[in-house]
Amino acid sequence: SYLTLSASEGSNALTVRWDIALRDLDYVLQLDRDGDAKLTWGEVRQRADDITRYATRHLALASGGAPCPLQATAPLQLDRHSDGTYAALALSARCPQLAQAVTVTYSLLFDVDPSHRGLVQWVAPGGTDAQALVFGTDSAEQSLRLQPPSWAETLRQYIWEGVWHIW
């Protein structure tokens, strides 16, 4: 899945865009109701609430030890990526306060596919460059700093993730 998180200066809200492959959602939620091995917009739309519930049960955000509850901000949409069609969820998380970092706990599909990875882009308040992170079973909880990373930190992270990916 592809998860984009961003925060704005002066706000306690986080903006969340989460694209999840329909093939993965079909595997766990059995979206293909007629069994023809082809998902239609109607089949996906009928299960939009189930998709949102499933996704938000597998993503937790917190800041300063307090949870930041997720809620949908727009109806489910579809988006095409190079490897297929994705459900695109528009969410927001309102935190009681944004402390120095946001703790993200990601567990989507880990119970059925331990090799699943979540690719995350994080844009800190006042930042223009996104920080890239990868969530996996061994890195399911990560801390996102509210200060934008330096160019050196960003480069180090890309090199680390690249080496880990090749390994």
Put a short name on every predicted segment:
Residues 1-164:
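N-terminal soluble domains immediately following signal/targeting peptides that reside
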